[in-house]
Amino acid sequence: LVVPWPRAISIRAALALTISHLLVQALKRMVNRERPDATALIRCPDRFSFPSGHATAALAVALSYALTWPGLAPLLVPAAVLIGWSRVALGVHYPGDVLMGQVIALATVAGVAMMW
Protein backbone atom coordinates (compact mmCIF):
# COMPACT_ATOMS: atom_id res chain seq x y z
CA LEU A 1 0.00 0.00 0.00
CA VAL A 2 1.44 3.35 -1.04
CA VAL A 3 0.23 6.37 0.89
CA PRO A 4 0.17 9.60 -1.17
CA TRP A 5 1.96 11.56 1.52
CA PRO A 6 3.31 14.04 2.16
CA ARG A 7 2.33 15.90 -0.99
CA ALA A 8 -1.47 15.49 -1.11
CA ILE A 9 -1.96 15.74 2.63
CA SER A 10 0.39 18.69 2.93
CA ILE A 11 -1.35 20.50 0.09
CA ARG A 12 -4.70 20.02 1.81
CA ALA A 13 -3.30 21.33 5.11
CA ALA A 14 -1.63 24.28 3.37
CA LEU A 15 -4.85 25.09 1.53
CA ALA A 16 -6.88 25.05 4.75
CA LEU A 17 -4.23 27.17 6.46
CA THR A 18 -4.13 29.71 3.62
CA ILE A 19 -7.90 30.06 3.31
CA SER A 20 -8.37 30.35 7.07
CA HIS A 21 -5.56 32.93 7.29
CA LEU A 22 -7.20 35.07 4.60
CA LEU A 23 -10.53 34.88 6.44
CA VAL A 24 -8.89 35.84 9.74
CA GLN A 25 -7.08 38.82 8.22
CA ALA A 26 -10.25 40.05 6.50
CA LEU A 27 -12.26 39.76 9.72
CA LYS A 28 -9.56 41.53 11.75
CA ARG A 29 -9.77 44.52 9.40
CA MET A 30 -13.58 44.54 9.33
CA VAL A 31 -14.15 44.15 13.08
CA ASN A 32 -11.17 46.22 14.34
CA ARG A 33 -11.44 44.82 17.86
CA GLU A 34 -8.61 46.12 20.02
CA ARG A 35 -6.59 43.67 22.08
CA PRO A 36 -7.25 43.37 25.83
CA ASP A 37 -6.10 46.30 27.96
CA ALA A 38 -4.14 44.01 30.28
CA THR A 39 -0.39 44.02 29.94
CA ALA A 40 0.45 41.27 27.46
CA LEU A 41 3.22 38.85 28.30
CA ILE A 42 4.39 38.83 24.68
CA ARG A 43 4.65 41.29 21.80
CA CYS A 44 1.66 41.37 19.45
CA PRO A 45 2.11 41.48 15.66
CA ASP A 46 -0.79 43.93 15.26
CA ARG A 47 -3.35 45.71 17.39
CA PHE A 48 -6.45 43.76 16.38
CA SER A 49 -7.52 40.67 18.29
CA PHE A 50 -10.64 39.25 16.62
CA PRO A 51 -10.35 36.46 15.60
CA SER A 52 -7.19 34.78 16.85
CA GLY A 53 -4.88 33.84 14.00
CA HIS A 54 -2.81 31.53 16.20
CA ALA A 55 -5.90 29.60 17.33
CA THR A 56 -7.08 29.33 13.74
CA ALA A 57 -3.75 28.21 12.29
CA ALA A 58 -3.00 25.63 14.99
CA LEU A 59 -6.40 23.97 14.74
CA ALA A 60 -6.57 24.12 10.93
CA VAL A 61 -3.28 22.25 10.58
CA ALA A 62 -4.07 19.79 13.40
CA LEU A 63 -7.49 18.92 11.99
CA SER A 64 -6.13 18.58 8.46
CA TYR A 65 -3.63 15.95 9.54
CA ALA A 66 -6.03 14.31 12.01
CA LEU A 67 -8.49 13.68 9.17
CA THR A 68 -5.86 11.62 7.39
CA TRP A 69 -4.46 9.94 10.49
CA PRO A 70 -7.28 9.73 13.08
CA GLY A 71 -4.91 8.05 15.52
CA LEU A 72 -3.04 11.34 15.82
CA ALA A 73 -6.18 13.31 16.68
CA PRO A 74 -5.91 12.70 20.46
CA LEU A 75 -2.47 14.33 20.37
CA LEU A 76 -2.85 17.03 17.70
CA VAL A 77 -6.30 18.43 18.47
CA PRO A 78 -5.83 19.03 22.22
CA ALA A 79 -2.40 20.57 21.55
CA ALA A 80 -3.94 22.93 18.99
CA VAL A 81 -6.78 23.87 21.33
CA LEU A 82 -4.27 24.60 24.10
CA ILE A 83 -2.24 26.79 21.75
CA GLY A 84 -5.37 28.82 21.10
CA TRP A 85 -6.27 29.21 24.75
CA SER A 86 -2.68 30.09 25.65
CA ARG A 87 -3.32 33.32 23.74
CA VAL A 88 -5.92 34.28 26.36
CA ALA A 89 -3.53 33.34 29.19
CA LEU A 90 -0.84 35.51 27.59
CA GLY A 91 -3.22 38.48 27.63
CA VAL A 92 -3.34 39.05 23.86
CA HIS A 93 -6.85 37.73 23.14
CA TYR A 94 -10.33 37.55 24.58
CA PRO A 95 -11.95 34.09 24.84
CA GLY A 96 -14.33 34.96 21.99
CA ASP A 97 -11.35 35.68 19.71
CA VAL A 98 -10.01 32.18 20.26
CA LEU A 99 -13.40 30.52 19.96
CA MET A 100 -14.13 32.25 16.65
CA GLY A 101 -10.67 31.35 15.36
CA GLN A 102 -11.35 27.71 16.18
CA VAL A 103 -14.75 27.87 14.45
CA ILE A 104 -13.10 29.33 11.34
CA ALA A 105 -10.52 26.52 11.39
CA LEU A 106 -13.18 23.85 11.72
CA ALA A 107 -15.29 25.31 8.90
CA THR A 108 -12.30 25.79 6.61
CA VAL A 109 -10.95 22.28 7.13
CA ALA A 110 -14.43 20.82 6.57
CA GLY A 111 -14.80 22.83 3.36
CA VAL A 112 -11.40 21.82 2.04
CA ALA A 113 -12.05 18.16 2.93
CA MET A 114 -15.34 18.23 1.01
CA MET A 115 -13.69 19.77 -2.06
CA TRP A 116 -10.43 17.79 -2.01
Residue map of PLM features:
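Amphipathic alpha-helical interface surfaces
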Residues: 10, 22-27, 57, 61
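Interfacial segments of alpha-helical transmembrane regions
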Residues: 1-22
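Membrane-embedded catalytic cores of phosphoryl/pyrophosphoryl-handling enzymes
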Residues: 41-116
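Transmembrane alpha-helix/helix-exit interface in multi-pass inner-membrane proteins
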Residues: 17-34
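Cytosolic, membrane-interface loops and tails of multi-pass inner-membrane proteins
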Residues: 31-44
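Residues at alpha-helix boundaries and short interhelical turns
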Residues: 4-5, 35, 69, 89
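Hydrophobic alpha-helical segments, especially transmembrane helices
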Residues: 13, 29-30, 55, 88
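Helix-loop junctions at the membrane-solvent interface of multi-pass transporters
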Residues: 4, 30-31, 115-116
